[in-house]
Amino acid sequence: MSAANIAVKVVSLLFVPFLNKILGGEAGYSVYYSANQVFAFVYVLTTAGLPVAISKLVTELTSTGNRKQAKQAFRMARTLMVLLGIVLSVIMAIFAKPIARYMNNEDSWMGILTLAPTVLICSLLSAYRGYLQGMKNMTPTAVSQVVEQIVHVAVSVVLVLGLRSRGIVWAVAGASIGTAVGAAAALIIVIKYYGQYQQDQRVLHAGEDLRSVPKLTNEKLLKLILYYSLPITINSGIQYGGNMIDTSIMKGRLMAAGLSEYDSRTLHGMMGVTRQLLNVPTALVTSLCISLLPVIAGLYAQKKYAETRQKANYAFKLCYIIAVPLSIAMCVYAEPLYVMLGLGSGAKLLSYMSFSILLLGTVHLQSSVMQSVNELFSATLFMGIGVLVKAILNYILIAIPSLNIYGAVISTYVSYIIPLILNHICLVRKRGVRIKMFRLTLIPMICGGLMLVGSMPVYLLSDFLLGKFAGTYVTETISLILAAAAGIVVYFYAMKKTGGMDSSDFSLILPANLRKKLKL
């Protein structure tokens, strides 16, 4: 799964600048980003909680030998997801133009309309993924994710190039159709895996007597599905709803600061590109630690509180081992990264926003730990407070001419710091889980500084030498790659020598062949 996640995120990272370019720059990307924010909000309402509920219920029921009811729970949740997907798809399609007006980007209506069927497809897709993950079969999810992203990118590029002569509205629609086709391809794959898996299970358990296995009523199954799914859905809905509100506010407040509509759309698109770039490392950071969370939940349920604290701190340790150097590197090397990816302006914005990787990674992990110790309602409340404060600050700060788009940077940091502090207080006071954040970030920060000391001379020397005969793109790209390689080696060696990482940490983060070459 982790290798598939990395592959998907790399493809996604490369797709953003390419799409930005073929849509005509940040102003065109702003239209796509607005449509995509609407889709992201509706998508999490249908797929954030119910697949988790399916996975959890299927795991619990199969562990007690109740495979028949595990399948029944899956079918029940799948029906709910399909019904919800149909309703939300129809709402998106019917109200595409009013929603686009609310988003303050009327050209995005066609993108919203063409994304509507994707909600239903993804609802069904997530149901099958949840079931197969609950049966401990991760291969279908991994394979389908990679295929989905490749098909999405390929179809989107072809359609955008074919339709952009008809204007930005149609070009964005082409990109949105690519999303639907990618999801449909993934759905075909998981259904095929599901069918084969069911056939194998029938052969494996033929003639098995299930009469002695305790059974749950349909009402009880439904209650469990809702109990497991609703808190996660609400939490994700608040977060993505906040992003949608930000998107609707931003362009209007930039115009209130005295900027033209085109300049406002350009800056809005610039922020969209920056956030999409930051989403990639943030997702990698959180996915690295997420496997520890069921262990934390199990330890807490068994009242092993000391071990719960230990595992929670270890999850944060892994988070900071990756998040700290990524934040530092994106801050310092934002300019050459933008050149390498073929993006226009916006490197300064990425540099200022880079440490949101660290903060958002922390908040996501805190929310997951709080879910594990039965404090998800509190985590949701604190996230909601952060979203509300962010919307208010965006409204005020973005309209200040001297700040404009950088007002959104300030509000972003504040919106993460608020739930971070409140989550920490809640975990310590109510559950006795103290995360030693300062201590856990100290060594990665020191080693991150050493990483810069090792990588910056490599970058500057390469930039100087190549600059004499090569163009800007080649010079910056090669210099950045060499600096990154030097920085990675220096960072991990420094972490080993300072005791920041041991062999078990390296085995979780680096492939075996790379560990062998670096002697880590």
Predicted regions located by residue number:
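Membrane-interface junctions at transmembrane-helix termini in multi-pass inner-membrane proteins
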Residues: S123-S144, F355-I385, I396
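Helix-loop junctions and terminal segments of transmembrane helices
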Residues: A48-S63, T274, T282-K303, F316
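Membrane-proximal transmembrane or re-entrant/amphipathic helices at the cytosolic face
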Residues: Y459-L520
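C-terminal transmembrane helix end/exit motif
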Residues: L159-L163, V181-P214, S415-F464, V489-D505
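Alpha-helical transmembrane segments of multi-pass membrane proteins
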Residues: N105-A127, L341-Q366, L381
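Short membrane-interface helical motifs at transmembrane helix boundaries
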Residues: V87-D107, P325-L343
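Interfacial/gating helices of multi-pass transporter permease domains
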Residues: L19-F41, I168, V172-A173, K220-Y228, ...
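Signature of the first transmembrane helix
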Residues: M1-V52, S89, A93, T118-V119, ...
